[in-house]
């Protein structure tokens, strides 16, 4: 079992228990705002693989401005760093959402970041100067 940690610059500490899915990048406006960049780099994990060791998270729930579904962002109460998001898509969304989407840039260990993203989401919102990730599945919207 492999663990990945996030704690270096922040007032929180969490562990991710591997294995988990490959990263994806998202081009939608909410993800840009969460990441403070042209895309977000996301790492979906099962809730049981995410272990908050220190700190307290604050949640805020919003309506996705591009697609209309509800999503929650969990962030550090002290430093404001976004840690993960959860999207609620579809008729059974609240009951089925058990997949924190970790903001991959918060990890101390760059191991999960070394491989290119397996998929790109919301490519219809991709900025014109941002290139396609070679070999990544391309999705017009959230999967």
Predicted regions and their residues:
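A short Gly-Trp-Pro
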Residues: 2-5, 12-143
């Amino acid at each position: 079992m492999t663990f990945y940690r996030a704690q270096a610059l922040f007032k929180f500490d969490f562990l991710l228990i591997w294995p988990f899915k490959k990263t994806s990048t998202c081009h939608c406006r909410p993800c840009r705002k969460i990441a403070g960049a042209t895309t977000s780099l996301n790492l979906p994990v099962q809730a049981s693989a995410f272990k908050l060791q220190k700190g307290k998270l604050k949640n805020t729930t919003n309506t996705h401005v591009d697609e209309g579904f509800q999503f929650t962002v969990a962030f550090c109460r002290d430093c404001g760093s976004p840690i993960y998001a959860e999207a609620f898509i579809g008729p059974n969304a609240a009951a089925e959402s058990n997949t924190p989407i970790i903001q991959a840039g918060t990890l101390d260990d760059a191991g999960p970041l070394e491989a290119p993203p397996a998929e790109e989401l919301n490519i219809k919102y991709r900025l014109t100067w941002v290139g396609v990730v070679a070999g990544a599945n391309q999705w017009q919207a959230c999967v």
